[in-house]
Amino acid sequence: MSSKRGGRSSLAKAPEEAVNGEAFAPEASPPPPGDDGDAGGEDGGAPAPPPPPATKGGPVAVGRSLEIQTTPDVCMEMLADKLKLLNYEADFCRKKKPYRKPLSRLYFAVPLANSSEQFFYFTSLATWLLGLAGVELPAPKEFDDPNLTCQNILGAVKKLGFAPPSYHPTKLTVGNGKEVVGVLDGLVDFVLERRHHKYSRPAYGNDGQPEEGVQLDDEAEAAAMEGADELAMPAQNQADDDEEEEGVYVDPGRGDAAGPGTGASAAMDAEKAVLVSKVDPTLWKIELERVAPKLRITIAADSKDWRSHLDEAHQHKEVISKAWPDSKTSLERLRADLNGTLEKLQTREKFLNEQFESLMQQYRAARTTFTDVQETYNRKTEAVADRNQEMHRIGETLEEVKAMMDEKGSNIADATPVARIKTAIKQLNKELHDMEVRIGVVSHTLLQLSLRNKRLLQAQAALSDEEED
């Protein structure tokens, strides 16, 4: 089920020949289902060797490619089947709410209307697969920077021993296409290999169908219909025929089957008694004549029928057999030329790897420095975002204080309360003046009354003195 992958870059191959002291072993492709007849000869062939075992302490293989050679739709169909082997529907789709829908067989192969949702599904699935592969990556968020998220995913994939892709990380931001399918397919293959998953040949059960190559021609169909017509014969005649056939197979050493003293004869008679039909032959024949036309099946000629395909296959086989001797020499010469060219390419590749080894080391150091600077930049960006949020919060508080000050200032600048206070003071002064006048009048009245009372008392005292004298 593994898809065909492109070779890695020639410059990136040699520096990554081994990880943790293990040499690179090319990925063994499992045999395609249904090809066990021709791949291994007449006996079905030996099963393909299993993929190399995974190493617990590091990457399984080095120099894997993230680029596919098949079309995205074909690779996506195989990717959906591989994800089912990892039980992603339970472990990924239904791990937390809201639940995700399982992938269709063309989800990442074609663009969808909601590209942001498609990209978020890709980043979440890639992060989950990286976690299964042993690389912890923070869970992506829906509104994260797409370019930064894609760079983080490719950086984590590179730690597993994958060769750097030839395309730019921004190709992954669209959320679909061969680049996205290639990344997911490579990660799924890596996880399956890490779990020591082995592909086995499919087991086909015997469903009672005729094997390929067996043709039911018109003569066989006619013979079958004749067999159906023979059922219309009387049951008694059939019983007689059975008796004749049984008479032929009588064992001479045991005597006649009808002779006395033989147990086989009694058992055979009992069997015959069971097999004798009690149906009226005439009614049987009438019923058969009524039902037989309904049981006849006429198979129309179809260009898509397997018989026509088999005939075409035989014709193609004959054409290939005739053309093979002439083309074999040309193919052998072409193979020799290709082998020579491959040897030259390998020699040239080794020379280039040795020549650019120092540049590759400088490139790795520059990439490491760039990664550190990028992380520092991300931290600074987060700090700036926090400061901006704090500045916005302080600005909102300042606006509220300004509004309160403006309200107080407007109240202070308003002269209406002062005028009211002055009017009230004048009214109070007037009332105080009136009260003082009234108090003076009352005091004068009291003074007069006290003087009058004093005179009366003096007069009474004088009268009382005179009376005493």
Swiss-Prot record:
PANTHER family, A to Z: IFT57/HIPPI (PTHR16011), INTRAFLAGELLAR TRANSPORT PROTEIN 57 HOMOLOG (PTHR16011:SF0)
Record-stated family: Belongs to the IFT57 family.
A cellular component term, taken from the record's GO annotations:
ciliary basal body
Q: Which gene encodes it?
A: IFT57
What this chain does, per the entry, is described as: Required for the maintenance and formation of cilia.
Entry-linked InterPro entries: Intra-flagellar_transport_57 (IPR019530)
**What keywords were assigned to this record?**
Cell projection, Cilium, Coiled coil
Tell me which domain of life the UniProt entry assigns to the organism this sequence originates from.
Eukaryota
Q: What are the start and end residues of every segment in region (Disordered)?
A: 1-60, 233-264
Protein location: Cell projection, Cilium
Biased segments, Acidic residues type: 239-248
Provide the protein name: Intraflagellar transport protein 57
**Coiled coil segments of this chain:** 326-440
Oligomeric form and interacting partners = Component of the IFT complex B, the core composed of IFT25, IFT27, IFT46, IFT52, IFT74, IFT81 and IFT88 as well as associated subunits IFT20, IFT57, IFT80 and IFT172.
UniProt keyword annotation of Coiled coil present: yes
Asked if the record carries the keyword Coiled coil, the reply is: yes
